[in-house]
Amino acid sequence: IANWFDFDTLSTTSENNFLPALNNTDTTVAYYVELSTNEFFVIENRKKTGWDTYLPGEGLLIYHGDWNKINPWFTSHSNTINITPSNRGYFLRPASGNAGDVETNRCPFPGATGNTNFTDNTNPASTLKNGTLTGKPITNIRYDNDSVMLFNFMSNLPAVVTDTVSTSS
């Protein structure tokens, strides 16, 4: 985002995406997923070693970003990116689905929750800030080894529509 490190963009369906721990690699350290013109996810792997030793948990972190909030920061340098709780610019999506778990071991996937999926139908759900489903699920989140995470990504999955069936006599 601010040229801190290299991103690989996920835009097509792919399996076994390889993601080494952020502090343990000289290759790709995060994936970028475009959700809309202005919104995106950043996916990174954090391991409790080196500068991350004192993290409350480890695993895959999913950040939700909004260029409408981030771009003004680049020009004004005013730290207002997350000043409005209902309209934040860059924030974590905790695996627990509870925003209060950001600073706990329930934040990373699978982490203490054991949550291995982030889809339109999970908690937390893969949605835009306005609640629109993304159709871009991240599934089968798992450890490949001690410091590498693997996951599957699907692109532009159609939304599931359900009809209500009523029975009358």
What is the meaning of each model-derived region?
Residues 9-159:
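Non-catalytic C-terminal accessory/binding modules of secreted extracellular proteins
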Residues 158-166:
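Proline-enriched interdomain boundary motifs that mark the N-terminal boundary
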